Amino acid sequence: MKHTESLAAATGRLIHSDDSSATVEEVQGLYGPFTFPELLLQRLWAEQTFQVERLQSHSGETVKVSYPGRWNRLAGPDFRDARVTIDGVSKRGDIEVHLRETDWHAHGHSDNPAYANVILHVVLFPCEREVTATGGMGEIPIVSLLPLLWHDLEEYAADDAIATMAARPSERLLGEWMWLPVTEARERLQEMSRRRWESKVRYARLRIEKLGWAEACHHTALEILGYRFNRSGMLRIATRFPLAAWRAGAMDCDAVFEAERETGGWALQGVRPANHPLVRLRAYRGWIGAVGDWPERLRREGLDWPNWDATELTESAMEWRRRVGFKARWMGVMRAIGALDCVPRPRADNLWGDGLLPLLAGAGHLREEQAFDWWRRAWPGDQPDSVKKTLRSLGVASGQTHPLTWGDVQGLLWWRWDQARQATLGRT
C-alpha cells in the first residue's frame, strides 16, 4: 500500500477565506469528515514535521532544507528568508505554503510582486504540475508533503485540537459536563475513549504497514520520548538512524543531538532537565543496550497475554487492577522489553497507552477488545493539569475507589476533538 493511499482522503471540498491562511480542506476521517487547515500545514513546514530526507520537487530534484524560513503571519509569503538547496544549487528566498497547487492562482499570487522572491511552493496534496507558473516571474519548483508525513491527516488535526484544549483553564472544559450525573459522565467518557482507542489502533496499523513491525516500534518509542515539543526531532532521528544502527552499539547520542540542533530541530525552552532530548536519547540507548530486539520481545508478550474477562462498567478501575494484577503485568512487560529502568513514569505510562498497546492491537498480536481494557484502565500518564483537574472536578476520578485512568483522559480529549471537528464544519 502506498503511503498516500493510507492517509485520510480529501472529499474535494476546499473552503477558502479572505485570509488565505484560514483556508481549510474537508477530509473524510474515521468518524466522519473533518477539516485540515492551511495554518496547520504551515506549522508542519515550520517544524519540519515530515521525512525531510525524502523531500523532492515534482520534477524529481532533491530538495534539502537548511532553514525553513521565518514564519510570516502578515501579508506576503508564508516564510521569509528560507535557505534551501535544489538539485545541488543553493537558494535563499521566500516559501509559500498551500493545501493545493491551484491555491497559488486562487489567492492571486501570480502577478503580485510581493511573491517575486518565492523559491519553493510547498503544497499538501500532490498534483500533475511540475512547477508553478508565475506569470512574468518565472517558474517555482513544487514539493508535496502528503507522501512524506509521519501520521494520518486526522491524527495531525486531532493532536492540534487537543493541544489547544490542553492549554485552556479547567473551568472552560467543565461547562458541558457539569450537569451530568457521575455515572452518566463515566459512560460517556468510556464511549469517547473507545473512539480514541480505535483511532490510535488505526494510526498504529498504518505505521506498521508503512515501516514494518520493528521500525514502527522504534519510531513510536522515540517519538514518545520526545515528549510534546520534540516529537518531530526524535522522529527525524528515528528515520535517519533505524533500529539496526542503535543495536550495532555505535550511537553517539551527543553527536546526534548536536547535528539535530544545528538545523534548529529542538525546542529546548521550558523543557525540564529530565525531559531534555539528549537525556532521552541516552535513555533509549540504554534501553537498546538492555534488550536490542525489544520489538520482538513485545510481540511475544502480546501473544502470551493473559485472557481475562472484559471489565463491567460497574467494576471500578481499582477493582479491575487488583483482579487482573495490572501492576505486575505492566512491570513484567516493561522489564521484558528493557524499558523498565530506562523510561520513568509517568512517561512510561504514555509509552504504554500511546505506543505499546496500540501497536500490539494494530499488528494483531493482541486482540483489540482485550487490549482496550488494559488501555483504558491503565494509569493516566503524563497529562495536562487542566485535563486532570477537570476530571476530578466532575467526580469521575475520586480517591482510591475510582482513580484517574488513561481512558478517562483520552475520552475527554477525544470529546474535545469531536467538538472542534464539528464546529469547523458548522455542525454544532
What are these regions (language model features)?
Residues 92-100, 121-123:
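Active-site ExK catalytic segment of metal-dependent nucleases
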Residues 122-243:
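Internal, well-ordered alpha/beta segment that forms a basic, Gly-enriched binding/recognition surface
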Residues 1-21:
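Intrinsically disordered, low-structural-confidence terminal and linker regions
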Residues 83-94:
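Active-site beta-strand-loop-beta-strand hairpin of nuclease catalytic cores
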Residues 23-63:
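Short Lys/Arg-enriched alpha/beta "domain-start" segment
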Residues 188-427:
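Hydrophobic, aromatic-lined core segments that form the binding pocket/scaffold
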Residues 109-114, 120:
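Compact, well-ordered interaction domains used in eukaryotic information-processing assemblies
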